[in-house]
Amino acid sequence: MAFHFPLMPRMFMAVRREDRHPIVEILRQTPDIPDTCQWGIFLRNHDELTLEMVTDEERDYMYQAYATDPQMRINGGIRRRLAPLMENSRRRIELMNSLLFSLPGTPVVYYGDEIGMGDNIYLGDRNGVRTPMQWTGDRNAGFSRADAAALYAPLISDPVYGFTAVNVEAQERAPFSLVNWM
C-alpha cells in the first residue's frame, strides 16, 4: 500500500472551488504502481491535512479556505478534523467521504471522522486532533476508566463536537446518523 499524499489536498480544493480539475489533474499525474500494490487514499493523514505536495499558491489557498486561524496550522499543513474542516456540514462531510470511497485506491478513514468528531486547536502540537475516541456520552467518553486528568489528551467537551453530543453509542441508535451512513 502506498499513500497517495498529493490527492488529499486536491479533494479539498475541488470541493471548495466546486471544480473537478484539481482531482483530475493529480490523477493524470499519478504514476502507475505494480499490480500487486494499491494506493491508500485518505482525507487526512493521521493528524493533519498535509500541504507539503502543493504549490505555494495552493497552500495559501488552502490556508485561506480551511485554516484562517494560525492555531489550525502545523508543519506546512492543517491540523483539523474533517467535521470542523467542513464547518460541520453533513452534506459536505458526505460529499468528501463519497469522493474518498469512489476514487481509485483503498480508502483510509481516520478515527472519529466516521462520527463527525471535532478537535481542539488550542492543544499543543498535533494533540488537538489526537483526543480520545468518543465511544459514549458517559465518563471519559467511554474511552478509559482512568481519571480524566490521566488521559493523554483532554476530551472534546464543547456543545457542538463534545462527547455528550457526538459519540458512537448515540449514533449507532440513530438510523440516519453519520456512522450509519458510512
Predicted regions and their residues:
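Active-site and adjacent substrate-binding regions of carbohydrate-active enzymes
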Residues: 1-182
